[in-house]
Amino acid sequence: LAEKLQRERAAETGAGIMNYKVVMAYDGSRYNGWQKQGNTDKTIQGKLEQILFKMTGEEIEVHGSGRTDAGVHARGQVANFHIDWKKLEVQEKRELEKNAGNQAGQGCKREKCGGKKTPDQIMEYINEYLPEDIAVLSCEVAPERFHSRLSAVRKTYCYQLEMGPKKDVFQRNYYYGLGERLDVSAMKAAAGLLTGTHDFKSFCGNKKMKKSTVRTIEKIEFEQSGSRLHIYFTGNGFLQQMVRILTGTLIEVGQGKCAPDKITRILDAQDRQAAGPSAPAQGLFLVNVGYEDK
């Protein structure tokens, strides 16, 4: 708490480059994922960077804790970005001096001038221009070396399944409608074999992955309410489409297509073809990103 107050005081007293941490929620249904792409503006990162440019007049890169795929949602995505307030202050002063004789409103290239903003003001500004399916939940000054992805020590994802015979048309973008009951006990047994540190190459959607595919899953938890089943995955990091492939494999276990003890052989195979299919994107939520307390 003391360090957080110190960072906020530094921001208020005019420190130059400030690092900001934001927590975001979004409905990924109509977006092509987190990462900005040159051929579309339908990305979460792209929307946020457009608004920061509107606010500062500068190109500001936003770093996300993870690149959620198209159609994937987030309740607790974490991102960070830097703003050089000293630089902006100097630029604004020059622009105002240069355009001293111009009409009101032409002296600054940014829509809203007026110096540095507090974290709350930044959050308010961003939310004013974000579409209704994206929101910044919190904004705070972060340590200089904080990076939303590189500083993360754990993440929790949730996959939502609907096992009822009739699909809920109003929840179709947030649940994978299976239309059949699953053997959850068998799925829990299989999940027990997935926890711990393993080489998850068989559960990686990137066949050209050259970096280590070893990850640690701390726990896999199941919450069932009626015909709805939520599966929570917590680990130190996840490979591309890993949670969706894990879910697809656990579904096959629940359907009786795959014995729980086959999980060990799937891990040992280190072959994507050995695991089950990738579950659809719409059922997946990034729930939480954890960091070391300092």
Please annotate each region the language model reported.
Residues G14-K294:
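Structured-RNA-binding interfaces characteristic of tRNA pseudouridine synthases
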Residues L1-I17:
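N-terminal amphipathic/basic-hydrophobic helices that include classical n-h-c signal peptides
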